[in-house]
From Swiss-Prot:
It comes from Haloferax mediterranei (strain ATCC 33500 / DSM 1411 / JCM 8866 / NBRC 14739 / NCIMB 2177 / R-4). This is PHA granule-associated protein PhaP. Polyhydroxyalkanoate (PHA) granule structural protein. Important for PHA granule formation and separation, and for cell growth. It is found in: Cytoplasmic granule. Keywords: Plasmid. Disruption phenotype: Deletion mutant is defective in both PHA biosynthesis and cell growth. The number of PHA granules is significantly lower.
Amino acid sequence: MSEQANPFTQFFQLQRRSIEQSQRSMHQGIEFQKQVTRMMVDGMKAQQSVSRKGTDFARTAVKSYFEMMDSSVPGDNRMYADVKDAMDEQFDSIDEMTEQTWDVMEESFEENADAMDEIMEQSLEYLDDATEVYLEGLQEIEETSAQVTPDTPE
């Protein structure tokens, strides 16, 4: 027994699969972009930690230097104490400014990452809607072609 088939059926199936695969690829690509954005935010936090440790190291080195000078040079130790106090104040100011800068940067990165997530989600919704409309149109065309195209034996 021979079956009758529309010669365009495979064409429509192939096109439908291709569109669906493209849609999945777009979803994966956008999810990857969202992950990269979050990794950048996390990387910035790691950089903040490294920066803080570098400042702490510099503070410790300067403090140790002045303590060494204070203990090895006879005379008026008040001079070294004043310099150490001034250096501590400078490092405190640097810490405060750096902390404020990192806070502003982190907040900005977070806001931008959230905004990007929203834009990407909206883009995916548009993509899904457009794909659905296209596939529905393709289905209608396939049905119409099935009605007007004579079947051929398989």
